[in-house]
């Protein structure tokens, strides 16, 4: 039982860590559409996090080759980082829209979409996408 529990905890940690990374990448994408340059302080302000927490996350994203950080501290998505961010952003937008069409309050729909976007399978998302676009 101990090993199974440890594996489950590890899986949950990895999933949450991945979700966190995806949220940061999505935030960088959104900010890059609004601002001329994106810095750690912009991300911290947008998410309401401490700059130190964001700095740790940026280090991790840089090590995964999802972002580059210039000497001036400007953060840019790499091609792989942009692909992940755009996938998450598309999921978020479509799932929010779907939930709102079902009568869910806009704020609740956005919060729920933010949770669902990280765990939904590609197959389920594509099925929802096809259904929404038929309507």
Residue spans of the language-model regions?
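Short, small-residue-biased leader/transition segments that mark boundaries at the very start
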Residues: 1-5
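C-terminal regulatory/oligomerization modules of transcriptional regulators
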Residues: 10-12, 111-135
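N-terminal helix-turn-helix DNA-binding core of bacterial DNA-binding proteins
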Residues: 16-49
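Key DNA-contact positions within bacterial/archaeal DNA-binding proteins
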Residues: 52, 107
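Glycine-centered, phosphate/nucleic-acid-interacting loop/turn motifs that mediate DNA/RNA or nucleotide
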Residues: 65
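Basic, amphipathic "hinge/linker" alpha-helix immediately C-terminal to the N-terminal HTH DNA-binding motif
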Residues: 73-91
């Amino acid at each position: 039982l101990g090993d199974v529990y440890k594996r489950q905890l590890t899986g949950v940690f990895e999933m949450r860590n991945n979700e966190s990374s995806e949220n940061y990448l999505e935030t960088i994408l959104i900010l890059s559409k609004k601002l001329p340059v994106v810095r750690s302080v912009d991300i911290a302000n947008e998410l309401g996090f401490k700059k130190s927490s964001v700095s740790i996350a940026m280090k991790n994203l840089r090590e995964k080759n999802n972002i580059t950080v210039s000497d001036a501290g400007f953060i840019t998505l790499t091609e792989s980082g942009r692909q992940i961010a755009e996938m998450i952003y598309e999921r978020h937008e479509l799932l929010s829209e779907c939930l709102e069409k079902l009568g869910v309050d806009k704020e609740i729909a956005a919060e729920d979409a933010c949770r669902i976007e990280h765990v939904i399978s590609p197959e389920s998302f594509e099925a929802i996408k096809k259904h929404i676009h038929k309507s």
